[in-house]
Amino acid sequence: MKPMYRSRSWRRKYVRTPGGRTVIHFERRKPKVAHCAMCGRPLNGVPRGRPSELRKLPKTKKRPERPYPNLCPSCMRKVMKAQVRASITA
């Protein structure tokens, strides 16, 4: 085993070969799930993947198709309400 693979930053995937041997394939771990910028809740509709994997996805699959895709829906509503209320009073 190469010294670089000894660290646990590489995921160990056990693969059975056609010859019947079990070998270890090393692959990078998936990053953590995306979180809301305001409250920190996990975001739905944002895939977990390394940048090289996400690069292959179309733009609509990388993030939600709504205003403020970096916020969860409830925080997005709060921000939009605050903007509207600020524009009414100004």
Curated annotation (Swiss-Prot):
Cofactor: Zn(2+)
Pfam families for this protein: Ribosomal_L34e (PF01199)
InterPro entries: Ribosomal_eL34, Ribosomal_eL34_C_sf, Ribosomal_eL34_CS, Ribosomal_L34e_arc-type
GO molecular function, one term: structural constituent of ribosome
Binding site for Zn(2+): C36, C39, C72, C75
Region (Disordered): 41-72
Name of the featured protein: Large ribosomal subunit protein eL34
Record organism: Thermococcus kodakarensis (strain ATCC BAA-918 / JCM 12380 / KOD1) (Pyrococcus kodakaraensis (strain KOD1))
Name of the gene this protein is made from: rpl34e
